[in-house]
Design a protein with these regions (language model features):
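GST-like domain detector, emphasizing the conserved glutathione-binding G-site
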Residues: 1-126, 130, 140
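Charged, low-complexity, helix-prone segments enriched in Lys/Glu/Asp/Gln
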Residues: 90, 196-200
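Acidic/histidine-enriched, glycine/proline-rich intrinsically disordered or flexible terminal extensions
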Residues: 200-209
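Short Asp/Glu-rich motifs
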Residues: 37-39, 186, 206-207
Length: 209
């Protein structure tokens, strides 16, 4: 049994979607970041960086923060969606790290400046929107000749998809990136994605282009 500490953010949805895909039993603990629940002492014991998501694996008592580390752990624990060795494993981790270092922080800045503070910092808006489109272009090129980023559906797709699901927040038209659009809609139809998207609470249907 996994205890999942999460909220309705792209990083949080990575893990709820993954747990559904892995078929692992889990208990959800909502951490409402709008109420600063992530800085409560009891949560800091699990996630010293006071960020969601975090997990505790009751099978062995292990607690983990950082969504990328959690995805690798769950992949290794179950033997699913993360190859055990060889190039396939490292391609999967490569694209997981791409998400952690690219779309995660950069699209997060787009949300901050474009959605929540539009007009307050034109330079920042221009900079991060430009980077958002560059990243979408990288992903579109990667998907030009393959169904998923590491060929087979993997934890890398689970990491990237929730950030693309906020394409409207990013003022991105997925029609500009047809390979991303095809990939996005394919994954959006997966039952585990539909279910995991609504954890820890239902805030609406999966956005569709």
């Amino acid at each position: 049994m996994i205890d999942l500490y999460t909220w309705t953010t792209p990083n949080g949805r990575k893990i709820s979607i993954a747990l559904e895909e892995f078929g692992l039993p889990y208990t959800t603990h909502a951490v409402d970041i709008s109420k600063d629940e992530q800085i409560k002492p009891e949560f800091l014991k699990i996630s010293p960086n006071n960020r969601i998501p975090a997990i505790v694996d009751r099978d062995n008592g292990l607690s983990l923060m950082e969504s990328g580390a959690i995805l690798i752990y769950l992949g290794d624990k179950t033997g699913k969606f993360l190859p055990k060795d060889g190039e396939a494993r490292y391609r999967t981790i490569e694209w997981l790290m791409w998400q952690m270092g690219g779309p995660g922080p950069m699209l997060g800045q787009v949300h901050h400046f474009v959605k929540y503070n539009k007009g307050k910092a034109p330079y920042a808006e221009e900079r991060y929107l430009k980077e958002a489109h560059r990243l979408y272009g990288v992903l579109d090129k990667r998907l030009a000749d393959r169904e998923f980023v590491a060929d087979a559906y993997s934890i890398a797709d689970m990491a990237i998809w929730p950030w693309v699901s906020r394409f409207e927040w990013q003022t991105v038209d997925l029609n500009q990136y047809p390979n991303v659009k095809r990939w996005y809609t394919t994954i959006a139809k997966r039952p585990a994605v539909q279910k995991g998207y609504k954890v820890p609470k239902d805030v609406g249907e999966v956005p569709m282009p």
